[in-house]
A protein has these predicted regions:
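N-terminal auxiliary interaction/assembly segments of multi-subunit proteins
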Residues: 1-144
């Protein structure tokens, strides 16, 4: 979809955050569970992903890229909603995505939250640093 090849490089049930996550998409979810999902992207991955999604080239963060990260967050949340249908974790509603710029923030998690983080590496021969190729999708959900 984004003209980008990725592979899973890690899964964790412990809350984690990328230290160089320049852009974070966040979306609320509710249904048989309640919580949120985040998409943490280094700037390079955000630019590559949105460039592929919109079939245009972006070299710096701008309103289109920020909006594109929100749309990617929405697409992933919609996929989770579909996959979790008719399970104890069924999601009936998702909110409008929000996008956080910068990495200097912390998220506090309520007691009883079930957390899952999946790390992906983007195949990008032009990017040497692993920190600029890895992004994360995180879910924090509690059954209601």
């Amino acid at each position: 979809m984004c003209d980008t090849k990725v592979r899973i490089v890690g899964i964790s049930k412990v809350p984690t955050q990328l230290p160089n996550s320049a852009v974070t998409g966040m979306i609320g979810m509710s249904g048989k569970c309640t919580g949120f999902m985040t998409l943490n992207l280094p700037e390079r991955v955000a630019l590559l992903s949105v460039s592929g999604l919109l079939q245009d080239e972006f070299v710096k963060l701008n309103p289109q890229v920020i909006d594109g990260v929100g749309e990617l967050t929405n697409i992933i949340a919609g996929g989770l909603e579909t996959k979790m249908y008719n399970t104890p974790w069924m999601i009936a509603n998702i909110t409008i995505p929000s996008v956080i710029l910068g990495s200097n923030y912390q998220i506090s998690y309520a007691k009883g939250i079930e957390y899952c983080s999946v790390s992906f590496e983007v195949e990008d021969p032009e990017t040497l640093s692993i920190q600029d190729r890895v992004f994360m999708v995180n879910t924090s959900l509690m059954q209601v």
